[in-house]
């Protein structure tokens, strides 16, 4: 009997180990912040003051927040105007241009196929795309001609996901490649496959894995999703990510009735906000057009802030949310490991995994990074979109933090916003 009791106690403790704790499968929206969250309700007012001040001063047209700890949403507020000119107030379910937030979705889609055994992370890209170059740029001449040499090592899928491939890494060469790949006989390409096969024929800016440079490699990842799955990127992403997670308002294309929910984008010119309503997330493709064949993989998605919060919570949960598993825990852990050489072009001690920027683990490595707040936990993941939609996933604190506005250029409000969130933690 005594032995049985001891065994029961052991089983009890094993069953309650941190690794086996349940992950929140839905968001909870309490009327007041629970004390168990250890969040100062009074200090959350700093968030409101910051964002309202930026709106009142005309620095940003609007701001939308979504902050949750352990699945409990403790700040989800809308500030400002969806459209300043008409006086239309921002709503929590408005649609935003996500731009490069598309990249993480594409990366996850590709990694679901990795889990299915379709490829190894260090497989050469040329194994699946024979058109892929094996040349590195040596010299680009003023007339557009260039000389090359053979790569020191093959371009791999790991390099694509970590933005260390060298594709489009030279700005002048990237312009040449972009101009060519976006146009065929003076009209845009009809499919992602056509576009990517044109892009990968250009020489690389550096040997794969030797540098970091933000580039259109995510489009290549998107084509590989189509190659391995046998389905259009849009269909596969809906099937494996958007629908399982309940991201019902996220897409590349929409029926016309959704237009009224899309916030107006703004540019800052001479100190004033100027409406640019016809700015689209992607390479000029109207999300309300009839031709929906082309879906860019590095940009192009639109959606609500809660939809993307669902994606972030899935990552935080180790691959599962809404009762559906998208990726395995070990795959998420692999994606969260730095892949870059140091130093690199990303900045002092810049770290990037397989789809996400990573806050360095060592405090000494973080002090020289100007665009990082020192408040954020080491190991956190983040990225965002060109029109200032940002997200952060903090496993240590159990936090997901999102701030959306559709305004360029950057106002640095993201870093200030992060400070106001973290200072409220008790």
What is the meaning of each model-derived region?
Residues 390-392, 397-407:
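Short, well-ordered beta-strand elements
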Residues 35-97, 118, 137-141, 286, ...:
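Short, conserved catalytic-motif segment at the N-terminal edge
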Residues 48-51, 71, 96-129, 133-134, ...:
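Active-site SXXK
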Residues 369-395:
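Low-complexity, glycine/alanine/valine/leucine- and proline-rich hydrophobic stretches
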Residues 24-36, 140, 181:
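Short, contiguous pre-domain boundary segments
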Residues 2-8:
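Sec-dependent signal peptide recognition
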Residues 14-15:
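C-terminal motif of bacterial Sec signal peptides marking the signal peptidase cleavage site
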Residues 135-375:
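Short, surface-exposed loop or secondary-structure junction motifs
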């Amino acid at each position: 009997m005594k032995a049985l009791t001891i065994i029961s106690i052991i089983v009890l403790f094993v069953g309650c180990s941190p690794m086996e704790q349940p992950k929140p499968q839905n968001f909870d929206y309490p009327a007041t912040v629970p004390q168990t969250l250890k969040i100062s309700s009074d200090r959350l007012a700093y968030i409101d003051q910051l964002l309202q001040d930026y709106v009142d001063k005309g620095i940003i047209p609007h701001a939308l927040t979504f902050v949750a700890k352990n699945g409990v949403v403790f700040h989800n507020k809308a500030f400002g105007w969806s459209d300043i000119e008409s006086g239309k107030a921002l709503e929590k379910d408005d649609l935003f241009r996500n731009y490069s937030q598309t990249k993480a979705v594409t990366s996850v889609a590709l990694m679901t196929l990795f889990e299915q055994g379709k490829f190894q992370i260090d497989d050469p890209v040329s194994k699946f795309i024979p058109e892929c170059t094996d040349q590195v740029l040596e010299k680009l001449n003023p007339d557009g001609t260039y000389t090359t040499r053979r790569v020191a090592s093959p371009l791999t899928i790991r390099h694509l996901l970590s933005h260390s491939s060298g594709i489009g890494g030279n700005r002048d060469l990237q312009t040449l490649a972009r101009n060519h790949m976006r146009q065929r006989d003076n009209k845009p390409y009809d499919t992602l496959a056509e576009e990517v096969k044109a892009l990968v024929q250009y020489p690389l800016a550096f040997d794969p894995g030797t540098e970091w440079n933000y580039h259109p490699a995510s489009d290549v990842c998107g084509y590989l999703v189509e190659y391995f799955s046998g389905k259009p990127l849009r269909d596969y992403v809906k099937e494996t990510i958007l629908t399982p997670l309940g991201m019902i308002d996220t897409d590349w294309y929409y029926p016309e009735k959704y237009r009224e929910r899309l916030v107006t984008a703004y540019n800052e010119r001479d100190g004033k906000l100027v409406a640019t309503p016809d700015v689209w997330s992607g390479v000029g493709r109207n999300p309300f057009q009839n031709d929906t064949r082309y879906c860019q993989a590095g940009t192009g998605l639109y959606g609500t802030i809660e939809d993307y919060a669902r994606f972030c919570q899935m990552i935080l949960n180790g691959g599962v949310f809404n009762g559906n598993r998208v990726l395995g825990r070990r795959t998420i852990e692999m994606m969260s490991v730095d892949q870059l050489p140091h130093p690199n072009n990303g900045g002092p001690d810049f770290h990037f995994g397989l789809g996400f920027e990573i806050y360095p683990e060592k405090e000494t490595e973080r002090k020289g990074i100007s665009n990082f707040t020192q408040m954020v936990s080491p190991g956190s993941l983040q990225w965002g979109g060109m029109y200032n939609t940002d997200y952060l996933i903090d496993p240590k604190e159990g936090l997901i933090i999102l701030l959306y506005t559709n305004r360029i250029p950057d106002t640095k409000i993201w870093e200030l916003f992060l400070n106001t969130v973290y200072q409220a933690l008790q």
